[in-house]
Amino acid sequence: MKKSLIALAVFGAFTGAAMAQGSNVQLYGLIDAGVTHYTGLSNGAGGTTSSTGLSSGVQSGDRIGLKGTEDLGGGLNAIFDVETGFCGTGTSQDVATAGGTPQTYCTGGGFMQRQSWVGLAGNFGTVMAGRQYTAQFDNEAAMDPFGFGLNGNIGNLSMVKHYGSYRADQVLSYVTPNLSGFTGVAAYVFAAGKGTVPTATQPNVSRAWTLNGQYGNGPITAGLNYTDVSNATSATAGGVATGAVKSWQLYGAYNFGVAKVSGIYEQAKQDFYSGNEKNWMIGLTVPVGPGAILASYDENKNSLALNGTAAPSGDTAKQYAIGYTYSLSKQTDLYASYAHISNGSGTAFAVGSSTDSFSGVAGQSSSGMAIGMRHMF
């Protein structure tokens, strides 16, 4: 009790000082816990294994953050958002970075690394600078009935997960105002790789830019995205990266009232490689009482091959998913979900969740189920 009072006093002092300066600061977050069971996971020795546990962030990654605005006058506002992930069920969860390092914060990669940006908003639109979600991720999450969460999320097979492009560091972005339903996003990433300082082994800094256009009016949503990442691929397995990865997305949704149908198609090509990687998903959301039935079909096909080498075969994976969410209030819901992935002879995907991430085994199927609760504050 004493600790709670101290924490409230400290936060109260902080927000009080901010409010005194004309700012509006809000504390927000969510905590999500669910019982999960996964099969078809890699055991590290060419075989499969299973996992059962109490996972955090099944539907949405656990987080806590501060966001705020300051009225600068003349319709101009200063805005910011800093957000950190945390592991609501403990740090023993099977969550790791792309390099295999366990994540203490479960999502985001570090303290205040889910988001951390500052910007200006006005009649001209919004300009933001810092660590931000990518437009590619936003598009997938918006079209996915599972919202990039639960066992059936599009991220199990998507290129956003494959290329690790959920968020980006050192992003300068501009979002247009809504122009009769049309909105646009333009962003430049100063450090799409490890940093902006060239090294002996990587003298070329990887940078990226993206353009996104979307139309939304009533029941209709449709959009297109193009992204270019420089110095991301090399002509040999261990060579210096001088080639680009270029990708695009086409997406749309229509809400019929009794059901919402959504879909997305995305494709990526790499310099020094023939072929491409393609992913597409079609989803269905059906409101039922205070909840909704969720369903989707997702397919990933990868024909990328280093120039001069044979194109891969059997590189197609398919995912079938179904779920249900039940709202107890505007802030609290219950959920249940199930997903199954059929891997081709050259794919090794595994079912995960918003936070759980696993590797599968080529040619072996993977399944996952979850039941849990999410509370937002």
Show where each model-derived region lies.
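Transmembrane beta-strands of outer-membrane beta-barrel proteins
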Residues: 28-34, 81-83, 130-132, 185-189, ...
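Detector for outer-membrane/organellar transmembrane beta-barrel domains
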Residues: 204-327, 338-340
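Structural signature of outer-membrane beta-barrel domains
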Residues: 34-38, 81, 85-89, 134-138, ...
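Outer-envelope beta-barrel architecture signal
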Residues: 4, 23-29, 70, 74-78, ...
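Gram-negative bacterial Sec-dependent N-terminal signal peptides
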Residues: 1-21
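Outer-membrane beta-barrel "beta-signal"
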Residues: 364-377
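Outer-membrane beta-barrel architecture
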Residues: 9, 65-67, 117-119, 173-175, ...
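Outer membrane beta-barrel
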Residues: 22-37, 51-191, 205, 214-221
